[in-house]
Amino acid sequence: MEHDEQRARRDRELGMDRPITRRDFLNGVAFGVGAALVGSGLGPFGSDAQAASFAQDAPGYYPPALTGMRGSHDGSFDVSHALRDGNFWRNAGTPENTRETYDLVVVGGGISGLAAAYFYRARTSPSAKILILDNHDDFGGHAKRNEFRPGGRLLIANGGTAGISSPFAYSPEALGLMKAIGIDVPALSAAARRAGNRDTFQGLQQAYFFDKETFGADRLVIGTPGGGGRGRGGAAGGTTWAEWLTKTPLSAAAQKDIARLQDAKVDYMPDLTNDQKKDKLSRISYKTFLLDYVKVDPSVIPFYQTRTHGLYGIGIDAVGALECWAYNYPGFEGMNLDPKATGRMSFTARGDATPKESYNFHFPDGNASVARLLMRALIPGVLPGTTAEDSVTAKADYSQLDRDGAPIRMRLGSTAARVRHVGAAASAKEVEVVYGREKKLYTVRAKGVVLACWNMMIPFICEDLPAQQKEALHYGVKVPLVYTTVALKNWQAFKKLGITGVNSPGMYHTGLRMELPAPIGDYRSAPAGPEDPVLVRMTRTPCKPGLPSREQHRAGHADLYSTPFATFERSIRDQFARALGSGGFDPARDIDAITVNRWPHGYAYEYNPLWDADWAPGQSPCELGRKPFGRITIANSDAAAAAYTDQAIDQAYRAVAELAAGKAL
């Protein structure tokens, strides 16, 4: 009882009882759009398709304005989970035949699916009939857009895929698509630099927050020493590691060893050649390297454990030491390693170690802008305007997605339940697609189908695939992650503390930072002063240290699906209060809105040399899994085993080319 009273009192202090801007409802209708789908006790599907009226057609339907739990929102995964568990068809009933026939059906409305529709039309005819199905209440897949209006001012954030970048140069096909929809990255980057506003937070530093649960005491340490690569953080006025560490609650042994690790130039494998060193480093984790070769005290590990979360969704216990060398983590400065990549490196690390032409840009809503511009190209009435710049503040009209007579149509809240050839795959002229939408089942037919959904679902919806291909599709386990955005009424606490963000290696979210201004077109997000509202970004990648990488991801899936929004909100408020409290931050007063973009199935699984085999060319699971099957081909980032937008586009191009080669166009 006493514990419950303490919990209730703490909740009041955090503001759990305070109203925040919550838009889980539009026009009195609860979202997500699939909330009534099959599941425990929800009853059977119906089959009445006559005069159907769907959520996306209603006036005011606008998912980017929703807050609360987003990403894979409730209702978006019911059908998929029922198919996985083998109980969907028990209550599904007989699908209603829409009598619709298309040239192409695309399952999955993310960037890969939209690109597949674009490439198909370009390869065939401007009047090609295409239907795109997606299980979420918004298009874009992981490339989602979040909108906030603190104080009545429009602020935009990405709810998933963040930027136009890749470890390797974009292919001609991916680059050509970008240019065709109006994205000229060098020009956009130059315009953003001319627009300025990036000096808004000039003079402010990063900070570290050490939490008592992990490090023995709550302590905010402003500034970060060192500099250099992605793994090191920013500089802090020439402060040495030894000086900075004295401000932390870390033990004397940990402080001594971290300073040694960061500053010393030691060859920890002096008897090995360059190639032998790289091979050895590829077969041990960075944690093992620190403990067994650098000989750090075990109390050092928590300081570095979560540093690889943002790239891999797992900690340094499950990421190879050679990967961390590629990202300039400490400990390798004296090992005299040549700068070349090796075959025993992940896709991302291999790219980071390979010189290439830089290609990088971040829209305010991340790659949701790529999806929106693709939608403009496919269905012009969806997004007004003519340029990438004017698209940022343009409001999408979702009622235009599925118009009678339009050559290209998109149906949201529509989960594919079965995809199979009408007849034998080798000789069939059509493919039948059954999908669930708002507690009804429908069928359509097409000359060809591109499955641009997640690989692990394909064996459940396309049961006729060969067993070896199904096994390959099941191999990759998508990386769970959370992108949380918090709208604050002001950033006075940040200003008072002299910081832009806080690294929190031991907390529920591993950091928080104010969103940098991203001026483009008419959009201006830079606050005039500390009294103006800002957006703060947080990330979480649940995992279970000690297990192999794929098992850690599975544990993370379960964690995210079982965690209610209230748990996220409580942890967010607690983290803000503890990290920024000394600057006067009051979570009950200063938080305006919270959006948690929950992605239990987030990044495409990238092969990890520490855990995965060295497959021969053409024999990796993604290559075996993406083989065409009759009039069905596969496009998604899983098919490349690389979580990058250009890879998703390249796989779409390949999938459409395979349809053409099979004469399915």
Feature annotation, model-predicted:
Residues K256-S414, A425:
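Active-site/ligand-binding neighborhood in enzyme catalytic cores
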Residues M1-I20, S47-Q50:
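N-terminal secretory signal peptides
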Residues D17-R18, D24-D48:
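N-terminal export signals
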Residues L412-L547:
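Mid-domain catalytic core of redox enzymes
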Residues Q56-G93, E147, K212-T214, D218, ...:
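Conserved flavin/dinucleotide-binding core of flavoenzymes
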